[in-house]
Amino acid sequence: MKLIYTEMSYSMTEILVNEARKAADQGYRVFYIAPNSLSFEKEREVLTLLPERGTFSIIVTRFVQMSRYFTVESSPSKQHLDDTTLAMIFYRALMQLKPEDLPSYGRLQNNSVFIEQLVELYKELKNAQLSVHDLTGLDHPQKQEDLIKIIELAETIMIQQDYNQDSPLQSFARAIKLGLLNNQLSKTVVVIDGFSRFSAEEDYLLSLLNNNCQEVIIGSYVSQKAYQKSFIKGNIYEASLHFLQDLAQKYHIKPVFATSNQVFKPAFSRLTQLFEATHDFSQVDWQLQKNDLDHFSLWQCHHQKEEIEHVAKSIRQKLYEGYRYKDILVLLGDMDAYQLQIGPIFDKFEIPYYLGKAEPMAAHPLVQFIESLERSQRYNWRREDILNMLKSGLFGCFDDSDIDRFEEYTQFADIKGFTKFSKPFTINSSRQYPLDFLNEMRQDIVLPLQELFKSQKQLGASLVDKLILFLKKIRLAENMQGLAQSQLEVEKNEEVWKRFTDILTSFHHIFGQEKLRLSDCLALIKTGMKSAQYRVVPATLDVVTIKSYDLVQPHSKPFVYAIGLTQSHFPKQIHHSGLLSDQERARINEIRNYRHFDIASAENSKKNHQTALSLFNAATKELVLSVPTVINETFDDLSPYLKELINFGLPLLDKGKNYLSYDNSDIGNYKALLSQIIAINRQDLIEMSDQDKMFWTVVLRYLRKQLRKQQLELPTSDYRLSTKSLSKEVIEVCFPKRIPLKLSATALTVFYNNQYNYFLKYVLNLNKTESIHPDSRIHGQYLHRVFERLMKDHTQEPFDNKLKQAIYHTNQESFFQQIYQDNAEAEYSLAILEDIVRSTAPILQLNQNIQVIDQEKNFHLDMGNEILVHGIIDRIDQLSDGSLGIVDYKSSANQFDIGTFYNGLSPQLVTYLAALKQITPHDINQLFGAMYLHLQDPKLDLVTFKQIDNTLVESIYKALTYKGIFSEVEKEHLSTGAYQTKNALYSNDELETLLNYNRYLYLKAAKHIKKGHFLINPYTSDGKTVQGDQLKAITRFEADLDMGQARRLVTLPAKEKKECFLTLMRKESHL
């Protein structure tokens, strides 16, 4: 064995490549070994350093891959054992054990997290060269007994199913020990680069290679100063020193110092020396030179998005200077926090990248489909799960519009559960759903699912066959092929499909002869899919590489950007969480000298120093270290390592907000520039210098020219929320000149509430989602129908009998039967409505001096050639003197307010009066009023009553009164009825004023509507809060930002309120 160390200013790879070339020139076969995470980059670096740029004599690979070169022919043809397969084997083992067999873990048998921990422990045991029987000294002896039962049973299953229990390194080591490879190894030289420690498995293999290979060469970075130190605790080279010293002691060899021809920039060397001096308690009498600072940058940004954008702009600048994407490396302090953001931002700046991390399959449509399938079976055809299956795009031949229509109907009819999905859809609504088409679609969905879900407990092989048959029926494979929109997506789908078929194969192999329920089968496949990962190799090598900063090696790329280096992530504090604690691992390691667990937490300090050292030397030309103030919506502090750099004299540059400028980095990319222009267009203008204004004026002019060529438009607006007028063609279609505009009291109220709401409801005809479950509208229809029947009954039957008959016959109508007999909740609503009817009906019995002359009266009120007002009057009453009045049933409290009417928000009663005046020969003198009747079950607070007597009954009837507009002329006739006339009496002249102003409100609204321009102007009564419909989801209206666009209501003091509003009405209606 040969141990080599060198300073950070030299290239260890060049030194080791020279050693490899010498061995290759002598006829030896050389294996150049790199860590798993670096083998791809190391292969490219090694081949670059070779004069011939390639050779068959030197193979750059990993330990695992090297073992396959030697054992591929002699390895037994056994099944491959991966993590998913291991999890299934442990699940099967736990199925065969009873809870009482496992005192410690019996309650966790079906816990997926526990099974994952078992898989991790099994892999650790293999790497540590330990068996489950070596787990002595645990905190609880029962833990070892349970683990022995589980793992031994799992290993028995592996043997039965012909799985290879040995790892590739174990098979390689066994072949060497048996002397099967002596001839080959005697002609082999092994060069090892990039390691600072070996696992127990690697350590054992290394000892065998040292005894059988021609030579083993290992290199590591250690300074000569550190190598000569006797006390190395806390030294930045502590990990490498321990690594070399352990090997030197074990193999009785002295490490040698070497140098390379390539020497990197002195700035990085000087920074390393300062860093070393800080941690080995020595002092230096010099600082970084001014020109050294040109190679380092410390950035501070407010949050991650700005940080990534600054990096992207800097990369574009490097390209402008002539560098390539492959010259750039981006390191992430927290992969999970940055992974979702960095992709879209780099795409915006058109920067091709390769993320050096396996992607989880959990977000892929195939995994979502399998998960929805499993949940549909487990939760008995829940609607959300069925729809998620359809929306995955992998079920059947349905387009998006079909799925949307199916979803809309199932929500309306509340279709959920197998019973409702299996029956034909028969319920319809005013929207007239295409039931024939929906039932055909329902059958295409239900039949294959029903055939699969009816599977009883049976052999796993049979369940897999039925699942595959189901997947063929729904054309899963064909739909999977149709998902891809690009070559990259095609490659991703191929990798996901391969993992899926591997999981099915493993399940068939392990559970083929075990009896399982379908729910267990789907749950196991779903768990395997959700935990699986895949990798996609980049289509070109000229990309920006992105990976975690703790995987970096010295001198990786000319330009390195390390971002997210906050105190929480740099250094990383690794704590193991599993079935064994670190204390238990340490006790086991004390007993087993040459076989040991890796305890990450025990090596945090020296590993973090090693990582920081590699990071500070990762670049060969320029290193940028960046830290955000806020990461994952949490404030974080500077890393202690960055604080050290600041003490060395490196300035911390506050990058601030990513303002737009006329720098090359801002305008070097068309797509990014266009997105920035759009961002400017959406925000308030910021303070700009004359030079800035001139620059952006020219840029906008150029962009508009380019956009016009592409028939695109850059929108401009003076207000935050603005609307466009309808085109003349649309206005002519929606509001023909020769046809009167149709309005109603409700439509007029909506218009004055918020003009844009009128546009949505009555121009675009947008409606809220319907539901078969009764709402306030359906409740109102029911109450109207009961009272209509009651008032039509002129028989001599007692009033209570008439009421019972009206309720009974209304309940028997098919429409109300479908709605109110669907479930217990609807039946409860019906019971409440019946109570309301019984409570309100006595008011009709008391008013014996009135006669109902008409109900549910349709009217069309002609207001000239411009407007036709339509509506339905619930009831028309006639007093004993022949005067007529209008009753409007309300399911909620309502009363006429002259101020609300003046502002256009309560025109209903006055509109009905105008209609009654038009459709009857009576003049204004013979109209006694228009009123609301609140249909309610009065609630009284019994605490306020001293005793139960007539006052209690009077209070009930006081709540059941008619409230509205009444004629002062009919005051005497109204006094004997249940009419609340206080502050509600109007003279004939005043009633005429109300009618004229009501006409003015309609004409004013119609004139504005026909112009085709609808404002976003919900009303406000106080100028501080908005009461009108804001439609935030559509208009993005915000009261604090858009109060200026709200319509301010006219409000007057309560004193003389009526007279003042009438005066205003007279003025406006006669303009």
From Swiss-Prot:
State which Enzyme Commission number(s) the record gives.
3.1.-.-
Give one Pfam family: ADDB_N
- Asked if the Swiss-Prot or TrEMBL record annotates the protein with the keyword DNA repair, the reply is yes
Q: List this protein's GO terms for biological process.
A: double-strand break repair via homologous recombination
Q: Work out whether the entry's keyword set contains DNA repair.
A: yes
Task: Name the cofactor(s).
Answer: Mg(2+)
Q: Name one GO molecular function term.
A: ATP binding
Note the SUPFAM superfamilies from the entry.
Answer: P-loop containing nucleoside triphosphate hydrolases (SSF52540), Restriction endonuclease-like (SSF52980)
Assigned keywords, A-Z? ATP-binding, DNA damage, DNA repair, DNA-binding, Exonuclease, Helicase, Hydrolase, Nuclease, Nucleotide-binding
Q: How does it assemble?
A: Heterodimer of AddA and RexB.
Q: Which family does it belong to?
A: Belongs to the helicase family. AddB/RexB type 2 subfamily.
Q: What function does the entry list?
A: The heterodimer acts as both an ATP-dependent DNA helicase and an ATP-dependent, dual-direction single-stranded exonuclease. Recognizes the chi site generating a DNA molecule suitable for the initiation of homologous recombination. This subunit has 5' -> 3' nuclease activity but not helicase activity.
Please, what other remarks does the record include?
A: Despite having helicase-like domains, this subunit does not have helicase activity.
Query: Know the name of this protein?
Result: ATP-dependent helicase/deoxyribonuclease subunit B
